[in-house]
Design a protein with these regions (language model features):
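Short, Lys/Arg-enriched N-terminal segments with co-localized hydrophobic residues
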Residues: 4-21
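N-terminal topogenic membrane-targeting module
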Residues: 17-31, 64-135
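Alpha-helical transmembrane spans
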Residues: 28-78
Length: 241
């Protein structure tokens, strides 16, 4: 059973010390489809005009090249997007402790455990990268802290394409935690021309006796499983005490 919870949305949330401010406009380009048709057509027209009127042809080629650049220039790579979310999480531990109102020595049963991943719900913009990994414009991270009697949870949601962030906290008694596990779910992303493709992803889930739960998609399932094993061992020992 959760014994405390609160949260907020802040459209103008200030960047904490050590974080790099998001370039939202640039990140948006990552999720926008590339359309070179207009630029190519203008370039072809420029080539045709060049034979009769070189100056007009050069102008046409320049305009066509500029239109193509607008589509491909300054577009972030897969690694750029990953770096953006990593930077945003750089101060998560300090942020979490402050929001929970805790000192680190109060939650020292084991080291904090965190899970994080891209959000794949219907409101998110989703793209399959060149590395065959799926990314979206929304991200979520969850961090757990462990005291002698309780598990303190901090959840941080944010967008990489607009200034939108949300924080929330929960506290659970060990005896009320039913399970911690990884599960599989599915989502879909647009492949253009009104078509979509489906994919599966793994997520972490904590469930309590009251039926409440916390879940978060995970980017690295192997690391997540090791963390879950550590949580299970601690929860089991606390219930047996």
């Amino acid at each position: 059973m959760a014994v405390a919870t609160y949260g907020f949305d802040n459209e103008n949330h200030k960047t904490m010390k050590g974080e790099i401010r998001m370039d939202y406009a640039k990140n948006k380009k990552y999720f926008q489809p590339v359309n070179l048709k207009l630029g190519i057509i203008v370039c072809i027209i420029g080539l045709i005009l060049f034979a009769a009127t070189p100056i007009a042809g050069i102008v046409g080629l320049a305009i066509g090249a500029f239109l193509i650049y607008l589509q491909v220039g300054g577009r972030p790579s897969d690694s750029d997007i990953d770096a953006a979310v990593t930077s945003q999480l750089s101060n998560m531990k300090a942020r979490a402790l402050k929001k929970l109102g805790l000192d680190e020595d109060e939650v020292s049963e084991i080291a904090p455990i965190s899970f994080d991943g891209y959000v794949y719900n219907k409101s998110a913009s989703i793209k399959k990268g060149k590395d065959d990994k799926y990314r979206s414009n929304k991200y979520q991270a969850v961090m757990f802290f462990f005291s002698s009697n309780e598990v303190h949870c901090y959840t941080y949601d944010f967008s990489i394409t607009e200034s939108s962030q949300k924080e929330s906290t929960d506290v659970y008694f060990y005896k009320d935690i039913v399970s911690v596990s990884t599960q599989t779910d599915g989502s879909e992303y647009s492949v253009g021309k009104g078509k979509s493709s489906q994919f599966d992803y793994e997520y972490f889930k904590l469930t309590t006796t009251g039926g409440t739960s916390i879940s978060c998609a995970v980017r690295n399932i192997d690391d997540a499983q090791r963390s879950i094993n550590g949580m299970r061992a601690l929860i089991k020992s606390k219930k047996m005490a």
